Amino acid sequence: MLRSDAVTKGIQRSPNRAMLRAVGFGDEDFGKPILGIANGYSTITPCNVGLNDLSRRAEEAARQAGGMPQMFGTITVSDGISMGTEGMKYSLVSREVIADAIETACNGQSMDGVLAVGGCDKNMPGAMLAMARMNIPAVFVYGGTIKPGKLGGCDLTVVSAFEAVGQLTSGNIDEDQLTAVEKNACPGAGSCGGMFTANTMSAAIETMGLSLPYSSTMAAEDEEKADNAARSAEVLLDAVKANIRPLDLLTNDAFENAISVIMAVGGSTNAVLHLLAIARTAGVSLSIDDFERIRQRVPVICDLKPSGRYVTVDLHNAGGIPQVMRLLLDAGLLHGDCRTVEGKSLREVLADVPSVPPADQDVIRPLSNPLYGKGHLAILKGNLASEGSVAKISGVKTPVLTGPARVFESEEDCLAAILDQRIKAGDVVVVRNEGPVGGPGMREMLAPTSAIVGQGLGDRVALITDGRFSGGTYGLVVGHVAPEAAVGGTIGLVQGGDSITVDADQLLLQLNVDEAELTRRRAAWSKPEPRYRTGILGKYARLVSSSSRGAVTDQPD
């Protein structure tokens, strides 16, 4: 029995069938599985501009395989284009909108399965949230990574353009050089090319078995990506017939595998937020402390941007995520019994993958010679973050700094100070009231952090925030500080000049002010007025949970 029988079977469903006939159903089609294709196509961003072609390939393959595809649209927000503006407040919000849209369309139309096609950062976790909520057979198709831009023999990504702004203000390049970077950074379709958030989350989904092997590192414009979309539709139909559902795959071990791979490839801080959200929706007991536990045993073995040398297409050519997983599996750092949407175990999927990385590349290193001996996403706690915070310490020579606080109530004020060269070596920059409630929406601080790196201060200035960081960020940065300022977190009590210690070695984020003074400040603190009362941002601020629990809106704290 199919779920779609609810709208296709029986005399009383004659009106329903009448409408389905108008969109292409014939007599022979009413017993076929109805497969939703959640198409994230948009000309808003290069990440999604190629998704319509992929969705059409999947649609045709589904029909040829014996299913009845029904395509519908989802939205996207371009993180790169909205970065540094008020529009970035809508980025994390769009994750919930995408999840709600997919859930609404699939459940409203009694679909038997769904193929989600996405590109930009929030498309991936948004689709995964919907899949976990509905628990109908599902496959995710990643739109693919952009190829690197080229300038002067160097690979460029969009982060190169953000960093060039800081280089310009510090006098290291001129406006013509900045313009040259701008014109060459993004050469075509695809998601941002380093191991930034989109590529991190697609790697996580591949690891957890809800997308096909090698698919997360394919280039958007290569033919193999279109072939992958078609094959994914065939696999979805098989999953419907075999009744393989997302919650069969999204186990505690699968989340641990995803975290291990994210550490190994040097992935984005946003993976912490998104995996916590997906796990919570899937009913899996995952906490922020699990990331630290796994970090302690999984090294970084991939030399990828933003802090490394290579881009995601280089990782693909070196063997992709399966090669990374095989190394981890052989070292006992991966659960090989986890199932995939193809019905195979992860160990079976990796059986033919070489046990050592190719000798003619240095993108993927052996575990005996890692880039970093431990994972790069450290969970810091202390009186500034009693619920935890996430530090990205890749590319940092010494992840320890004690210095005076430079406090800003918004990203814009912080960026202005950096570009005016008012931030000096040794400073601890605090950007607050940018959390899930306070922002609302947890804006990403790529513009300030890139400007700091561009000015040569990446190792000598720390930036902490209750907001987020782009996957393109690196340096001594600490985000997701919880509790956030807007709900009374200690970050809201920091005053300019206070001493703050950021110590990733000791996993400490500490405001060096005595408890009596903090008690006095807390008594004088009052909850700030909401920045938005109506519209989606007002609604989001009222519903959203703490970042330490994934910042979800359908399961209040």
Curated annotation (Swiss-Prot):
Keyword Amino-acid biosynthesis: yes
Binding locations of Mg(2+): D79, D121, K122, E444
Cofactor(s) essential for the protein: [2Fe-2S] cluster; Mg(2+)
Subunit structure: Homodimer.
UniProt record, GO biological process: isoleucine biosynthetic process; L-valine biosynthetic process
Protein name in UniProt: Dihydroxy-acid dehydratase
A Pfam family matched in the record: ILVD_EDD_N
Cofactor-binding details, from the entry: Binds 1 [2Fe-2S] cluster per subunit. This cluster acts as a Lewis acid cofactor.
